């Protein structure tokens, strides 16, 4: 009897944290590009400006908030998706149909997006702080300090500013990443040319990262603008209308850096996740 291993519910959060440590500078540059009122700098120019102005370590501003976000948002969506997927397939002979994976991904992402909104808000603010004049900077010491100060100075409700947008984006990203990864891996393995190895994980996660980038970019731009606002937007629709005034391309501002960040992040997340599953997962006997 052969032996397989299933992922533990918290592996998704750990894998996402590992990926976030590698891709955080790209995430920071993406936020900077999206919060420009006009297109002035591209990714390389923005990176050089940040390093020149605040030093190399400034590329890791807000890392604690990013890790906090992964341990709320990503842990929740991975835990729900993988737990429900494994439950739904434990007595079946084959994998879930793709539409079921999409449904699971949507539900998991909506829930994870809502749970992760407070940490996401602090993450965006910490990354964008260096762009503000010194007198206007929030200067959060770390993620927990940011969460506490937002709740104390602006209200608990403010912690969930942009929750609708974050949840919607979470659903799209999770469909793009988890659902498409499962489907891509299934299709790659079904060819018979590749086995369940690191190269298969790389190819499948690269495809998933591309799908997630295209699905969520317009919502990602609106979410970032809403979370970084000081009350100038009345809601999601108003934010969308104001962004539309800048032209259709405004909804895809930062698309290239978003892909440069999200695709490697997706690849690293699933590479870490598969290694965690392989070495530390729950043993599942199979015939």
From Swiss-Prot:
Query: What tissues contain this protein?
Result: Expressed at very high levels in white adipose tissue. And at low levels in brown adipose tissue, kidney and liver.
Q: Which Pfam families match?
A: Mito_carr (PF00153)
User: Repeat Solcar: residue ranges?
Assistant: 7-87, 100-187, 196-279
What's its catalytic activity?
A: (S)-malate(in) + phosphate(out) = (S)-malate(out) + phosphate(in); malonate(out) + (S)-malate(in) = malonate(in) + (S)-malate(out); (S)-malate(in) + succinate(out) = (S)-malate(out) + succinate(in); (S)-malate(in) + sulfate(out) = (S)-malate(out) + sulfate(in)
One GO BP annotation is:
glyceraldehyde-3-phosphate biosynthetic process
Could you tell me which species this protein originates from?
Mus musculus
What sections of the protein cross the membrane?
9-29, 62-81, 102-122, 162-181, 202-222, 254-274
Subcellular location(s): the record lists: Mitochondrion inner membrane
Q: Which UniProt keywords apply?
A: Acetylation, Antiport, Lipid transport, Membrane, Mitochondrion, Mitochondrion inner membrane, Repeat, Transmembrane, Transmembrane helix, Transport
Q: How does it sit in the membrane?
A: Multi-pass membrane protein
Role this protein plays: Catalyzes the electroneutral exchange or flux of physiologically important metabolites such as dicarboxylates (malonate, malate, succinate), inorganic sulfur-containing anions, and phosphate, across mitochondrial inner membrane. Plays an important role in gluconeogenesis, fatty acid metabolism, urea synthesis, and sulfur metabolism, particularly in liver, by supplying the substrates for the different metabolic processes. Regulates fatty acid release from adipocytes, and contributes to systemic insulin sensitivity.
What name appears for this protein in its UniProt entry? Mitochondrial dicarboxylate carrier
Among the GO molecular function terms of this UniProt record, one is: antiporter activity
Q: Which InterPro entries match?
A: Mit_carrier (IPR002067), Mito_Metabolite_Transporter (IPR050391), Mitochondrial_sb/sol_carrier (IPR018108), Mt_carrier_dom_sf (IPR023395)
Q: Which GO terms describe its cellular component?
A: mitochondrial inner membrane; mitochondrion; nucleoplasm
Q: Which gene encodes it?
A: Slc25a10
Describe how its activity is regulated: Regulated by circadian protein CLOCK (Circadian Locomotor Output Cycles Kaput).
N6-acetyllysine sites (modified residues): 158
